C-alpha cells in the first residue's frame, strides 16, 4: 500500500467512524416542507417548524406542562388504566396494543388531565395524546374527562381541553361510543352552572371526539392547518364521488365557514387562553397587554 493510499484510507475510516457516532434523534424532518431540523431547536420552538411554521403533533404531557405555571401542575385521575373487558382481538389482541402503546409513550392511556394555574389563575386542563393509539377515546378517557370537569365545577374554574384524536376506540365497541354521551352530559352541566369550557382542536381532531366534546366549547379554537372533521377527506371523496374544495376540513376553511371561533398560533396559545379565562370569569387580565400599556401611557 502506497503512502497516499494509507493516508486516504485513514481519512476515510475516521470519517465513517465519526458519522456512525452521531446519535439517533439529533435531526428530524418537517412533515410539511421536509426541511431537516435540529431536534433540540424544534423542541424549544414547541414542535413548530421554524422554516415554514408547520404545527407538528405535540406530546400531551409536554403541552400541558408548558401551558401551566411552573411547578403548579397536579395530575387528576392518574391511577385510571384501560381494561380489556371484551377480550377484543383484531389483527392483535387489545391488551397487546395497550401494552405496546404504554411502552411507546410512557402513559397509561391517550388522555391526561391536570389541575394547575395559568398566569396565577386556577384552571383544569386536559389533552389527548395522538401517539397513544391515535388518541382514541375509550372508557378511561371518558372517566378522566368527567373527573376533570367535576373538579372545574367544584372549584368554579375554567376547563381547557386540547383534542388530537382519530375518534372512538373501536376495541372498546359500545363502551367507547358511550363516552360521547358521557362527556357531552357533563359539559351540559358545566354550561348550566356557567363554568367556561374552552376547546382547542389540534391536528387531527376526527370521529367521535369531533362529534362530541371537541366542538362543544364555549369558545372553539384551532391550531393552524389542523385537520378537523368526522370522516377524513379521502373517505368523503370516495363516498360522494366528488372532488372536495381545496383546504376542506382544515382549520382555515372551518373558520371561514363559521365552524370555529379563532385560529391561534401555538406560541400565542398560553397568553390567549389566559386572557379568555380572565374575560369569561370577570377577572382582570393577569398580565399587561400592548393595548393596556398604550392606554396607561
UniProtKB/Swiss-Prot annotation:
Co-factor remark: Binds 1 zinc ion per subunit.
Disordered: region residues: 1-23
Highest taxon above the source species: Bacteria
Domain CoA carboxyltransferase N-terminal: 26-295
Family annotation (Pfam families): Carboxyl_trans, Zn_ribbon_ACC
GO MF terms held by the record: acetyl-CoA carboxylase activity; ATP binding; carboxyl- or carbamoyltransferase activity; zinc ion binding
Catalytic activity: N(6)-carboxybiotinyl-L-lysyl-[protein] + acetyl-CoA = N(6)-biotinyl-L-lysyl-[protein] + malonyl-CoA
Annotated EC: 2.1.3.15
Amino acids binding Zn(2+): 30, 33, 49, 52
Cofactor(s) this protein requires: Zn(2+)
Cited function: Component of the acetyl coenzyme A carboxylase (ACC) complex. Biotin carboxylase (BC) catalyzes the carboxylation of biotin on its carrier protein (BCCP) and then the CO(2) group is transferred by the transcarboxylase to acetyl-CoA to form malonyl-CoA.
NCBIfam families in the cross-refs: accD (TIGR00515)
Name of the protein in its database record: Acetyl-coenzyme A carboxylase carboxyl transferase subunit beta
Naturally occurring in which organism (per UniProt): Actinobacillus pleuropneumoniae serotype 5b (strain L20)
Gene expressing this chain: accD
